[in-house]
Regions:
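PAS/PAS-like sensory domains across diverse signaling proteins
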Residues: 14-16, 26
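PAS/LOV and related PAS-like sensory modules
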Residues: 1-13
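PAS/Per-ARNT-Sim sensory domains
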Residues: 45-57
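Short loop/turn elements at sensory-signaling interfaces that couple input to output
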Residues: 83-98, 104-107
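PAS/PAS-like sensory domains
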Residues: 6, 58-68, 82
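PAS-family sensory domains
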Residues: 70-76, 89-90
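PAS/PAS-like sensory domain cap-loop motif
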Residues: 24-35
Length: 109
């Protein structure tokens, strides 16, 4: 199986999508243009929302540790991804969002 390119997802401090590349759109099963402005939590299963919020909050505090997470594709199916997220800050040091790379996990949970 050929290696898939990583998805890149840039998420604002209010969790809205600022940018998603074609690979990220493919992971989520939605056109990239439809992701812009959409809440990133729309792609999280409701039962996983508290864990997703904790991860988002940890990135806001500066955590850069990678993690594995289950996303909800547009068709409702689950997909496990390995995520490397880095907080973005403005010149004043204020948190403005997260840039993340997402790769399809070789191992399903």
């Amino acid at each position: 199986m050929p290696e898939q390119p990583d998805g890149i997802w840039i998420i604002a401090s209010d969790a809205r999508t600022l940018f998603a590349n074609a690979a990220m759109a493919e992971i989520l099963g939605v056109p990239a243009s439809e992701l812009i402005g959409k809440p990133s939590f729309d792609y999280v299963f409701p039962e996983d929302a508290p864990a997703a919020q904790k991860l988002f909050d940890s990135k806001q505090r500066g955590d850069t540790n990678p993690f594995r997470f289950k996303l909800r594709r547009q068709d409702g199916s689950p997909i496990w991804v390995d995520v490397q997220g880095t907080p973005m800050r403005n010149a004043a040091g204020d948190f403005i969002g997260i840039v993340g790379t997402f790769s399809i996990s070789a191992r399903q949970e």
